[in-house]
Amino acid sequence: MPFEAVIGLEVHVQLNTKTKIFCSCSTSFGESPNSNTCPVCLGLPGALPVLNKEVVKKAIQLGTAIEANINQYSIFARKNYFYPDLPKAYQISQFEVPIVSDGKLEIDTKEGAKIVRIERAHMEEDAGKNIHEGSYSLVDLNRACTPLLEIVSKPDMRNSEEAIAYLKKLHAIVRFIGISDANMQEGNFRCDANVSIRPKGDEKLYTRVEIKNLNSFRFIAKAIEYEIERQSAAWENGRYNEEVVQETRLFDTHKGITLSMRNKEESADYRYFKDPDLYPVFIDEKLLKEAQKINELPSAKKIRYMKDFNLKEDDANLLVSDPLLAQYFESMLHLGVKAKTSVTWLCVELLGRLKAEITLENCGVSTHMLGALAKRIDEGKISGKSAKDVLDKLLEEQGGDVDALIEQMGLSQVNDTEAIVKVIEEVLKNNADKVLEYKSGKDKLFGFFVGQAMKNLKGANPSVVNAILKEKLG
């Protein structure tokens, strides 16, 4: 029996505010355990939360980017549950009236463009972090009370490819509009996947399983694919009702399987009620208009790159996958580098040399350095082959002066026409017999003349040498 998957995603995006959502503690990552804490995020009796206005602004920006409704009146609620990393024994979140509702994202699939509906996005505080070591556990509350947006999609995705396309687009959007660093390794962009199956053509929604805390696109895809296989096998073996229950599962990255963690709670189990310590959030027209001014979205940037610079779709897609790539590209254009040269030296040459621990952020080659190198190629002052040696040197030394390196390495091309003409005439004079052979039809000898001229000139511009040789040989 053919099955189809029904997939909905809950994405937790940590906002890049300087301070936490309900207190003035820093949100900086990697500090000593429990150093970025205060009575509010420790949940001490009598400590009262105060909403960070920047969180509201960033929520509005996200809502604008996904073409959603911005609810100018929303409320905070307490989500009650007990866990060691939640000191208050409740999480401040939004339930009945979220700040953002009814959005959408368009994704590219094998069958063409597809709309994924977004049910809601709401503000909430993050929990702390449990660290398990041997027979005991530690709790670090530095992350407690950091601001999150939880973005909840409708169950509109039908396979892991669509889920990853949605996540990658959302990941790019939150980075381009500047509301989150979305660093998956640091937990700034985490995903819970709700997965169920049904016979193809059936519109009924069957038992869904939630897979928690996935933080890499590769593992998200693997977890979804495994869960689809597990549920399909259970159905075909007649054990669906016994083996597929509403529960929370974890993905074991080593074994490539999902494992049962606990029964999945319903919303009633959390006993949501309005938080009495926080006023309702009212967004006036001034704040709304101010926050709705967002940076150019990746989709619009892609269209502009293809239209204005005649880029291929694959190249444009790569450039808009990362704000830093787009920044490098546009900076190179501002330096006067041709669009095609910029794409080649950024997306092929520089990215192709970066390894696991070396990234665009820490490679040491700035936009100005790469732009200067690419411009020297456009100007004919250095060959593409020699420029690769300069780029290798820049990476090795974590940066440097491009023009100084070209001179030090003796890679500057000769563009002096008079000097080139003089050498070419000497080459032709010394090889008069081969000139006669060339003129009698042996066209392959042209490469010989180019080689001799380049050898004597030691760094001439090949295109200039070719043009003059063709002229001299008739």
From Swiss-Prot:
Leading EC class: ligase
Keyword terms: ATP-binding, Ligase, Nucleotide-binding, Protein biosynthesis
PROSITE patterns found in the cross-reference section: GATB (PS01234)
Molecular function per GO: asparaginyl-tRNA synthase (glutamine-hydrolyzing) activity; ATP binding; glutaminyl-tRNA synthase (glutamine-hydrolyzing) activity
Record's catalysed reaction(s): L-glutamyl-tRNA(Gln) + L-glutamine + ATP + H2O = L-glutaminyl-tRNA(Gln) + L-glutamate + ADP + phosphate + H(+); L-aspartyl-tRNA(Asn) + L-glutamine + ATP + H2O = L-asparaginyl-tRNA(Asn) + L-glutamate + ADP + phosphate + 2 H(+)
Entries under Gene3D superfamilies matching the protein: 1.10.10.410, GatB domain, N-terminal subdomain
InterPro entries xrefs: Asn/Gln-tRNA_amidoTrfase_suB/E, Asn/Gln-tRNA_Trfase_suB/E_cat, Asn/Gln_amidotransferase, Asn/Gln_tRNA_amidoTrase-B-like, GatB, GatB_C_1, GatB_Yqey_C_2, Gln-tRNA_amidoTrfase_suB_CS
EC number: 6.3.5.-
Pfam families (UniProt xref): GatB_N, GatB_Yqey
Domain of life: Bacteria
A GO BP entry: translation
Oligomer and partners: Heterotrimer of A, B and C subunits.
Family membership: Belongs to the GatB/GatE family. GatB subfamily.
Function (record text): Allows the formation of correctly charged Asn-tRNA(Asn) or Gln-tRNA(Gln) through the transamidation of misacylated Asp-tRNA(Asn) or Glu-tRNA(Gln) in organisms which lack either or both of asparaginyl-tRNA or glutaminyl-tRNA synthetases. The reaction takes place in the presence of glutamine and ATP through an activated phospho-Asp-tRNA(Asn) or phospho-Glu-tRNA(Gln).
HAMAP family registered for this protein in UniProt: GatB
Name listed for the protein in its UniProt record: Aspartyl/glutamyl-tRNA(Asn/Gln) amidotransferase subunit B
Gene name of this polypeptide: gatB
